[in-house]
């Protein structure tokens, strides 16, 4: 009789040894950055990194300097922390860094979408055409109508100025931005009330997926959570299917243009459904959280909300409603709000923390701003974490942890774009949208959504925190590296609609 216990044990030892051997044997070569493999074979620093990426990278930078390589789950990541050296990485004139390969694996895992030739360029092309210029103007009009519908027609809010409503600020912002954004991009049927109910149900499922997302990316889910992720993926593929889209009117030109490209490439409808899921996530995953932080900072800083309201009055006039069902709003005003622009940019500096990743597909030499050169090894991943290296750099942004609503304003009220590090002008003084080939193609629409929502809230509503002395919530450390951070807990607030004439 075969003793399967010892046999399986020996087999596991062999497999583990095979997996760990490359990491155990790896040594730092001449000209390479400092190498820190950690104490656990293969895993390296993976657990500390996932527990709190920000604190881990701070420790590594203190230990090794501005460039270092760490082992994370069998993969080697080299972090560059000097923003004055970012330029050549983002331009990649040597063509030795690749973003697409990593991104394709990620979207296949998370959304089930298998990339086709030319779709990355297609997304950027469609976004340039429909999420900027005249295309953006048209979409802003649709978004204003959707916000009016979600915030006024459907909620049944009392127009009595004495009627206060209480809610949780994060959920409030996320729900409104998600539902209005979803309806604006994916269209309506003839039954708009039913559309809103479905959008609300979709939001609830979206939040379930959202909460699992960080650990899903790192494959750290429990068995039941894996089953839940599978259920949610199938649900989104069904609810966002192209067959359902055919029943709707007013699908955005942006989405329609991209789906047309996929059809012309012969992409099956089932894969188009998964593409829609990816686009929903890309368009709605950060605007709600960003709006939450922006409104919370305004409520915690009376001088800031006063300045935004004064600016809004200058460019919009007195706030009013049209037929009590829609906001009267001059969309052109979005281009003339430098104070609000500074508030949003400061919010993103404080709370947007993406990671920029590039696969090194050939040995790559980086010349730092100091003149020192480092060799990056083929197969490693080059990583930038601008939140730590740029946003929180006191040389670039004095008192970096403090919210200053006018940080991005010149004394004359114009936008400030001149920032310096060690006396040298720095081009990348904030990087909330990524940069280079991985820059967010929908950033202009996302900014418009956030600005439009904030302007409607501060001009048409009285707002106050239930507890004015409540401290800002900490960020959820699981979300470092995934765009706009989310709070560790929600904050209660009150609001009431201004009286109508």
UniProtKB/Swiss-Prot annotation:
Q: Which residues hold heme?
A: 440
Q: Name one Pfam family in it.
A: p450
Chain ranges passing through the membrane: 1-21
Kindly list the positions at which Phosphoserine occurs in this protein: 326
Name the tissues where it is expressed.
Answer: Liver.
- Does Iron count among this protein's keywords? yes
- The EC category is oxidoreductase
What InterPro entries does UniProt report for this protein, alphabetically?
Answer: Cyt_P450 (IPR001128), Cyt_P450_CYP7A1-type (IPR024204), Cyt_P450_E_grp-IV (IPR002403), Cyt_P450_sf (IPR036396), Cytochrome_CYP8B1 (IPR030686)
**Which keywords appear in this protein's UniProt record, sorted alphabetically?**
Endoplasmic reticulum, Heme, Iron, Lipid biosynthesis, Lipid metabolism, Membrane, Metal-binding, Microsome, Monooxygenase, Oxidoreductase, Phosphoprotein, Steroid biosynthesis, Transmembrane, Transmembrane helix
Q: In which pathway does it act?
A: Lipid metabolism; bile acid biosynthesis
**One biological process term in Gene Ontology:** positive regulation of intestinal cholesterol absorption
Q: SUPFAM superfamilies in the record, alphabetically?
A: Cytochrome P450 (SSF48264)
Q: What does this protein do?
A: A cytochrome P450 monooxygenase involved in primary bile acid biosynthesis. Catalyzes the 12alpha-hydroxylation of 7alpha-hydroxy-4-cholesten-3-one, an intermediate metabolite in cholic acid biosynthesis. Controls biliary balance of cholic acid and chenodeoxycholic acid, ultimately regulating the intestinal absorption of dietary lipids. Mechanistically, uses molecular oxygen inserting one oxygen atom into a substrate, and reducing the second into a water molecule, with two electrons provided by NADPH via cytochrome P450 reductase (CPR; NADPH--hemoprotein reductase).
Assigned protein family: Belongs to the cytochrome P450 family.
Q: Per its record, how is this protein called by name? A: 7-alpha-hydroxycholest-4-en-3-one 12-alpha-hydroxylase
Q: What is the lineage of its organism?
A: Eukaryota, Metazoa, Chordata, Craniata, Vertebrata
